[in-house]
Regions:
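Substrate-gating cap/lid alpha-helix
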Residues: 99, 235-284, 304-305, 310-314
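Catalytic core of nucleotide-activated saccharide and alditol-phosphate transferases
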Residues: 65-130, 231-233
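Well-ordered, non-membrane alpha-helical segments in soluble/globular domains
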Residues: 17-26, 58-73, 102-115, 163-173, ...
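Conserved SGNH/GDSL esterase-like catalytic core that processes O-acyl groups on lipids
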Residues: 11-12, 16-24, 28-31, 40-50, ...
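Active-site segments of SGNH/GDSL-like serine hydrolases
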Residues: 81-95, 187-190, 216-258, 285-290
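Extracellular serine-dependent O-acyl
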Residues: 82-84, 224-231, 260-298, 316
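Surface-exposed, active-site-proximal loop segments in enzymatic domains
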Residues: 61-63, 95, 191-202, 236-250, ...
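N-terminal pre-catalytic "stem/leader" segment of glycosyltransferase-like enzymes
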Residues: 1-51, 87-117, 134-135, 143-144, ...
Length: 316
């Protein structure tokens, strides 16, 4: 039996949690259970340690450095552990760094033993899986997940930035003899924050470069391609966390202009897919309200730019 579990913070079971979707994607790939909250994982043979989508190198401890229950459980466990996505952090060193302001229980815990256990744990990355399908994109890539696919997620990456790097750069670490399809999903961030800052027709050049880069991927790796159109645009009243701001604002350009740009991107992507024999994909029209806006009900609660996992192309 296999489980996905977190040691330093509880995995959320909220069905609208975009952050929680990464654990569910891993669970789908590994055919594993997700251990939510502080539930026990001792009945499992193998446990893959989930560090969250945005591991910062420290513990986010509600109420301060007091409770060591989860660390003691991990230290005592006989399960075989693996670290998802990143090298196993030194939880012992992180715990010791909080000794100046902590509970007696925290101060007396054997952090050195925890360090030694962390050293024994092997990292598992998506690129180790050698699956047939790869999805490459920004943080919205989760929303187009299809069962048993590798996901190469680059939070905050614009289409422009990805093209400057070259799309082959993202495929190369995942390439193997079984890889036969790659799906690309970029562009939402460009539309939200960047492309309307330039009144020089740069969107035409961006789409032309996108097509050329996609051709390079197909020529080099001989894979089928799918390209996803940008997500529908939500109403401007949507409250967003400051992490979604750029240059102090939640978006640049009004709804009409950004929607026009989204339609341009979608039309050009569909046209290049038609000409080159690639698959064109876009989110369901049912995600829009009667004004043509992305419905808040379909978005992560309480505030985010992302879809709720309930409304992904394939519900997790």
């Amino acid at each position: 039996m296999i489980a996905i579990a977190s040691i330093h913070y509880p995995i959320s079971n909220r069905k609208h949690s975009h952050r929680g979707s990464w654990a569910k994607i891993w669970a789908n790939i590994l055919e594993a259970d997700v251990v939510y909250g502080n539930d026990d994982y001792e009945k499992y043979d193998r446990v893959y340690i989930y560090h969250g989508m945005e591991w910062s190198g420290s513990f986010n401890l509600f109420g301060g450095a007091k409770d060591v229950t989860q660390f003691q459980r991990f230290l005592d466990s006989k399960c075989v552990f693996f670290s998802l996505d990143i090298d196993m952090p030194d939880y012992g060193a992180i715990g010791k760094s909080r000794l100046s302001n902590c509970s007696e229980e925290w101060a007396n815990f054997d952090w050195d033993a925890l360090t030694e256990k962390c050293k024994t744990i092997t990292k598992v990355k998506m690129s180790d899986l050698k699956l047939c399908h790869l999805i490459v994109g920004d943080s919205h890539a989760n929303s187009v997940y299809k069962g048993k696919s590798m996901v190469d997620r680059h939070d905050g990456k614009t289409l422009h930035g990805a093209l400057m790097q070259g799309l082959n750069y993202y495929v190369e670490p995942y390439y193997h003899s079984n890889l036969n399809k790659v799906t690309f999903y970029f562009g939402n961030i460009d539309i939200r924050h960047h492309i309307l800052r330039y009144a020089d027709g740069s969107e035409e050049e961006l789409m032309a470069t996108y097509e050329e880069e996609l051709k390079r991927v197909q020529d080099r790796y001989g894979v089928k391609l799918a390209v996803v159109a940008p997500l529908w645009i939500e109403n401007e009243s949507r409250k967003l966390p400051k992490s979604g701001y750029y240059d102090g604002t939640p978006f640049y350009g009004d709804w009409e202009d950004r929607n026009r740009m989204r339609e341009f991107f979608a039309q050009r992507i569909e046209a290049m897919c038609d000409v080159n024999g690639w698959e064109f994909k876009q989110h369901s029209e049912s995600l829009k309200n009667d004004k043509g806006e992305l419905d808040f009900e379909c978005m992560e609660k309480p505030k985010s730019v992302h879809l709720s996992p309930k409304y992904y192309m394939e519900e997790l």
